[in-house]
């Protein structure tokens, strides 16, 4: 059984389900119901802490680019509940953006917000290390090749959390900066840091 916390459109667990055809459909939870959520998974619009209190058991719990939404206390609470929700030899995988030399294309204000968020992630990694103790780290590099038009649309839709609190005016100004700064095809390497814990 697989649980994906902060699943968004559920692209990852949907791809896993397509490839491995698990007996139990993976469950994806998120506080936002995305209109494009994949159909081959079970989606629930619910917060992680509330859901994990049900104490169902899982073989794999994914926590993807979600830790920055938690306070330090709530992150500890989340990790404790996640550990309790694992079957024997179950795994927790925590994915987060690489905090050093991040290559995500940004306009000035977006970069400033992102750096602030990544700094906070560094402090949260220490909490994760202290709580889970026996962990291993891996970096996953994704080569991204995206049209400027599509990337601008993603910014408009506030695809990354560092854009969420910006005003429409700031987004508009940022988009014009992106339009003049980048070529029609934007290429970069997106690096995700993965923290792995086994029960």
Question: Where are the regions a protein language model picked out?
Answer:
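Short catalytic micro-motifs in class I SAM-dependent methyltransferases
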Residues: 65-66
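A conserved beta-strand element that flanks and buttresses the S-adenosyl-L-methionine
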Residues: 62
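Conserved Class I S-adenosyl-L-methionine
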Residues: 136-199
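Short alpha-helix
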Residues: 117-131
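Conserved class I S-adenosyl-L-methionine
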Residues: 93-119
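Class I SAM-dependent methyltransferase SAM/SAH-binding core
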Residues: 3, 8-51
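A short glycine-rich, Lys/Arg-flanked "PGG" loop and its adjoining helix->strand segment in the class I
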Residues: 76-88
């Amino acid at each position: 059984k697989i649980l994906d916390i902060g699943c968004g459109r559920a692209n990852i667990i949907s791809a896993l389900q397509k490839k491995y055809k698990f007996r139990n459909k993976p469950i994806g939870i998120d506080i936002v119901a995305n209109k494009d959520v994949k159909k081959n998974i079970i989606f629930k619009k619910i917060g992680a802490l509330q859901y994990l209190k049900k104490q169902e058991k899982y073989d794999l719990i994914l926590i993807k680019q979600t830790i920055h939404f938690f306070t330090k206390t709530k992150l500890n609470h989340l990790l404790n509940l996640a550990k309790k929700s694992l079957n024997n030899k179950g795994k927790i995988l925590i994915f987060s953006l690489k905090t050093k030399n991040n290559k995500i294309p940004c306009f000035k204000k977006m970069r400033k917000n992102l750096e602030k968020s990544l700094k906070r992630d560094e402090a949260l990694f220490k909490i994760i290390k202290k709580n889970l103790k026996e962990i291993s780290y891996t970096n996953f590099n994704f080569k991204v090749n995206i049209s400027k038009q599509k990337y601008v649309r993603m910014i408009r839709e506030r695809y990354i959390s560092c854009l969420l609190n910006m005003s429409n005016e700031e987004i508009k100004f940022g988009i014009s900066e992106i339009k003049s700064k980048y070529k029609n095809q934007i290429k970069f390497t997106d690096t995700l840091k993965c923290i792995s814990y086994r029960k």
